[in-house]
């Protein structure tokens, strides 16, 4: 406990800085900032005034490390950096920290359009966004391709190809790679696409309509039809925007709290367009003020890949505006104003974001409480020492002993944790021996990169024979984790599941019980992930091995088929005429492909 470090705390400087609470094996438990380090650390000595969570943390602290900074701004930035890199156990945990997806147009002589997430490279790309979902980006790029015939290929492919790719054949690219369009004309199309992304749709539409009418008056009806289609696709892009608008680039933030959870929502405007409201959730908030939570969030949010606009709006309850402004200036290298709403429009937008935060938080808590109720009941049924926070579910998949794969699905008190999922390509040749496959998967799981993360409960898709396998692996690796094997009934029907545990008789649960339905959902998710992972592996191998075996199919035709159809499944569903549309594929070759693909899929499925 910290009392034994009383002398160290008393000798701490009365200056700005950051402190780290460090536990066993040099594990960082908490990172905090302070305007006065000595005063802040002294607060931890008032043990009776601390929350239970902080008391538990302090019982694990072995030492305190101090970093002095020049001012509060540097302390805020350093704290955010350390929290992001160290992920301390007792700090606020932000969920959904993904970068916003953007659309990029490269600064190449013949620019490429693409979807992008990550840190910005301003010397190489123009960025447009942010968008609230990858689906919105994909649809917008597709519409821009159809409207302006822009390339999406890599620069390497662009510089090396000798003939147009399938994008040209399906009228989504003008093939600048092989001079099917002049550089000036292509750059004009790029300019129109950029203007569209900047919100100048009306100007671009008028240009396209003028050209369409000109072509029509000159009786060049084929070209006029092309420009007519461009206008149609341009209008589709316009339809995707939502109702709210704001004159300047701005982000509106709100924060709503209940219990130990906070929801921070952001509503973004770029080029007068609304890009939607996105909720983020922060855990472990009970000991922090709204100012602390939001200031840390904003620095992390804009210190990743999200470029701050010229102004952001925060609730009136946030008072540290100047500190946030100075921190964001250091992050963005440009002035960013942090404002309170001053007029009805701004207040309405902040209220809209607040309402979204409130709704998202309420739904999150409802889901959490429902899930917690199931987990409490599960812990009683399976005699677990505590309510599980991390459940790992394991399943295997193979076809006649080939293409063997094992998967791990993870669930917590908030639902499935998809970023924690893992798949294991079975290295040994076990010819479909499920016991040996499970042994390899569990051995690799508990001796690999994430061996330090110990779950509270394991659920194995298997029967009584798996119990000894799991027990042996855990004993060899000195892992103490409760587990159960879940097997379907004699007819492999859901609802007749039997459970097998070490030292207990087999048992079943009522088909309509909440825990039974929950366990079925865990098992089904593992099965889905196993099948999906296996299918991807199978299709990849199928592409390489099976398409290559078809006489007349080389690498170029194989790539053209996959570029056009996207998957083997889509090829099998295609018509003869559709396959003939691929450059270089005759009617006879198309018939061979269809026959071969459908036969192989029949065998595989």
From Swiss-Prot:
Belongs to the UvrC family. It comes from the Bacteria. Keywords: Cytoplasm, DNA damage, DNA excision, DNA repair, Excision nuclease, SOS response. Its main location: cytoplasm. The keyword Cytoplasm applies. The UvrABC repair system catalyzes the recognition and processing of DNA lesions. UvrC both incises the 5' and 3' sides of the lesion. The N-terminal half is responsible for the 3' incision and the C-terminal half is responsible for the 5' incision. The keyword Repeat does not apply. Pfam families: GIY-YIG, HHH_5, UVR, UvrC_RNaseH, UvrC_RNaseH_dom. It comes from Wolbachia sp. subsp. Drosophila simulans (strain wRi). This is UvrABC system protein C. GO terms for molecular function: DNA binding; excinuclease ABC activity. It is found in: Cytoplasm. Residues 14-92 form the GIY-YIG domain. GO terms for cellular component: cytoplasm; excinuclease repair complex. Interacts with UvrB in an incision complex. One of its GO terms (biological process) is SOS response. Coiled coil: none annotated. Residues 202-237 form the UVR domain. InterPro entries: GIY-YIG_endonuc (IPR000305), GIY-YIG_endonuc_sf (IPR035901), GIY-YIG_UvrC_Cho (IPR047296), Hlx-hairpin-Hlx_DNA-bd_motif (IPR003583), RuvA_2-like (IPR010994), UVR_dom (IPR001943), UVR_dom_sf (IPR036876), UvrABC_protein_C (IPR050066).
């Amino acid at each position: 406990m910290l009392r034994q470090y009383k002398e160290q705390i008393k000798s701490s400087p009365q200056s700005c800085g950051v402190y780290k609470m460090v536990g066993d094996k040099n594990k960082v438990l908490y990172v905090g900032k302070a305007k006065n380090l000595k005063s802040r650390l002294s607060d931890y000595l008032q043990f009776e005034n601390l929350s239970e969570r902080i008391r538990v943390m302090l019982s694990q602290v072995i030492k305190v490390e101090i970093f002095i900074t020049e001012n509060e701004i540097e302390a805020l930035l350093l704290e955010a950096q350390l929290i992001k890199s160290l992920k301390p156990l007792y700090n606020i945990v932000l969920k959904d920290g993904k970068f916003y997806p953007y659309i990029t147009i490269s600064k190449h002589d013949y620019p490429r359009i693409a979807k992008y997430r990550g840190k910005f490279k301003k010397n190489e790309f123009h960025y447009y966004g942010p968008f609230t979902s990858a689906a919105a980006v994909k649809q917008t790029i597709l519409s821009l391709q159809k409207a302006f015939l822009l390339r999406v290929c890599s620069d390497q492919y662009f510089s090396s190809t000798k003939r147009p790719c399938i994008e040209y054949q399906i009228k989504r690219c003008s093939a600048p790679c092989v001079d099917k369009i002049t550089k000036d004309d292509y750059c004009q199309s790029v300019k129109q696409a950029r203007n569209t992304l900047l919100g100048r749709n009306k100007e671009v539409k008028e240009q396209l309509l003028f050209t369409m009418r000109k072509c029509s008056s000159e009786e060049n009806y084929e070209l006029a039809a092309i420009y007519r289609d461009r206008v149609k696709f341009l209008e589709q892009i316009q339809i995707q925007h939502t109702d709210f608008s704001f004159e300047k680039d701005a982000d509106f933030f709100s924060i709503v709290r209940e219990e130990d959870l906070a929801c921070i929502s952001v509503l973004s405007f770029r080029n007068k367009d609304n890009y939607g409201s996105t909720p983020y959730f922060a855990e472990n908030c009970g000991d922090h003020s709204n100012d602390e939570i939001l200031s840390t969030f904003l620095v992390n949010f804009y210190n990743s890949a999200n470029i701050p606009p010229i102004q952001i709006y925060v609730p009136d309850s946030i008072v540290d505006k100047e500190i946030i402004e100075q921190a964001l200036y250091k992050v963005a290298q440009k002035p960013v104003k942090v404002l309170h709403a001053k007029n009805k429009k701004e207040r309405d937008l902040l209220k809209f974001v607040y309402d979204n935060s409130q709704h998202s938080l309420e739904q999150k808590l409802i889901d959490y409480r429902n899930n917690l109720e199931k987990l409490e009941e599960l812990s009683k049924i399976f005699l677990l020492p505590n309510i599980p926070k991390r459940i790992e579910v394991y399943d295997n998949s193979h076809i006649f002993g080939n293409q063997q794969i094992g998967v791990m699905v993870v669930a917590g008190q908030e639902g499935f944790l998809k970023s924690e999922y893992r798949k294991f390509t079975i290295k040994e040749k076990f010819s479909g021996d499920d016991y040996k496959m499970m042994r390899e998967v569990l051995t690799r799981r508990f001796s690999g990169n994430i061996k330090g993360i110990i779950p509270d409960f394991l659920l194995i898709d298997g029967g009584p024979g798996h119990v000894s396998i799991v027990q042996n692996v855990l004993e060899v690796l000195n892992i103490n984790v409760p587990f159960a094997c879940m097997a379907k009934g004699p007819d492999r029907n859901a609802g007749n599941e039997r459970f097998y545990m070490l030292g207990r008789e087999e048992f079943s649960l009522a088909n309509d019980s909440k825990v039974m339905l929950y366990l079925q959902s865990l098992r089904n998710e593992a099965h889905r992930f196993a099948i999906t992972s296996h299918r991807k592996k199978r299709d990849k191998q199928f592409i390489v091995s099976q398409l290559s075996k078809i006489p007349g199919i080389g690498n170029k035709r194989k790539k053209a088929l996959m570029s056009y159809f996207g998957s083997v499944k889509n090829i099998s569903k295609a018509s003869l005429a559709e396959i003939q549309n691929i450059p270089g594929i005759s009617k006879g070759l198309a018939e061979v492909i269809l026959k071969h693909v459908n036969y192989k899929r029949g065998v595989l499925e």
